[in-house]
């Protein structure tokens, strides 16, 4: 629920001030009343999200002097002047100078309320635009959503339209397409940006652990639960909860998550007491949850509860015009991080960028740019076919080509097993069997991670 709009009310007439305050409070405003302009001015700042209503004739600083101070503080802060009959020419001049409105005494209560509501709506739009502008500037520095294709422009516009609402969002896209980037932008561009952004990969935790991680637990809730634990949902209260790979959430946990979305409350393990939570949920899936066949055992009612707004991130192969721009950005960033000169992009490299399928999407492109910056991608990662004159048989050539594809995938994902499996689309056992058959050591590819990159060897 949004907070009631704020009003600073200034009038030295105690009875009139009290009557106006009661009228505004009955209309849903939160009113701070002051007998002097000096006292009110001390509580104002450029970040004040409300409006100012002031009488003109007051001892000390009068309403017009206060208006000039407010104009210097924030020219977009709406001020309504309350005037006597003889002050109307002064009030009209103030309107021309930037005051929002004037109300001549005596006035009906509805006149005051209507003017205040219009002024508050104007202020709300001003503050929202400022918030989005600040967040967009901050995000563009360290969290890019780069692309000039129409589909990316539409995605950016949609993000800006929904970011500052509290609507839950479902983000759909392939592995590495940037779902967490979108979720983080939704948080940073929203009024929740000062709260926590809490992420959880539902596919990375076993069923026995995920409920404790999400909902928390009390001491003695299960074997090993020695002390109280705050869950991810409660930790995200006041901010944003990002649930990645939500399609992997166990069915029993889905039931509890549906309750959280509907009631905005949790029940930690080991207690029957509920706790309210104020969260926005952004869920991500790499399968089409709207397709019953792809959805599997994911609950239909949970899908519809999350599917208030769905953002679809296109794979990189469907927006190839963005690849040179993205690659240049990643290459410059990696070169700066590694303390290297930005290497020139050769014609062969441009051809590779344009023709490669990029199964790992933006993440694969970013990793590739880092390897180019380090000078370890001289062959561009392209699997080399066996020469026709080598005398190798067809099965031998296929074996060699398969080994090259495995090495390329491991290189693209820095040895991360989960990402490599997703890119290749093969089961884990098949993957390890092929590594053993071809004599490939996964650890060799983990070691290619650059400085500052987390060691992927733990991601098994």
Swiss-Prot record:
Q: Which InterPro entries match?
A: AAA+_ATPase (IPR003593), CheY-like_superfamily (IPR011006), Homeodomain-like_sf (IPR009057), HTH_Fis (IPR002197), P-loop_NTPase (IPR027417), Sig_transdc_resp-reg_receiver (IPR001789), Sigma_54_int (IPR002078), Sigma_54_int_dom_ATP-bd_1 (IPR025662)
Q: Where is the Response regulatory domain?
A: 6-120
Entry protein name:
C4-dicarboxylate transport transcriptional regulatory protein DctD
Post-translational modification comment from the UniProt entry:
Phosphorylated by DctB.
> 4-aspartylphosphate is carried by which residues?
55
Function in brief: Member of the two-component regulatory system DctB/DctD involved in the transport of C4-dicarboxylates. When activated by DctB acts in conjunction with sigma-54 to activate the transcription of dctA.
DNA-binding region ranges: 417-436
Task: Tell me a GO cellular component.
Answer: cytoplasm
Q: What would you give as a GO molecular function for this chain, any one? A: sequence-specific DNA binding
Any one Gene Ontology BP term = phosphorelay signal transduction system
Region of interest (Inter-domain linker), ranges: 332-345
Location comes to: Cytoplasm
- Source gene? dctD
Q: Recite the UniProt keywords alphabetically.
A: Activator, ATP-binding, Cytoplasm, DNA-binding, Nucleotide-binding, Phosphoprotein, Plasmid, Transcription, Transcription regulation, Two-component regulatory system
- Give start and end of each Sigma-54 factor interaction domain: 145-374
The record lists the membrane-crossing segments as none
Under the heading Pfam families, the entry gives:
HTH_8 (PF02954), Response_reg (PF00072), Sigma54_activat (PF00158)
Q: Which residues bind ATP?
A: 173-180, 236-245
**Top-level taxon of the source organism:** Bacteria
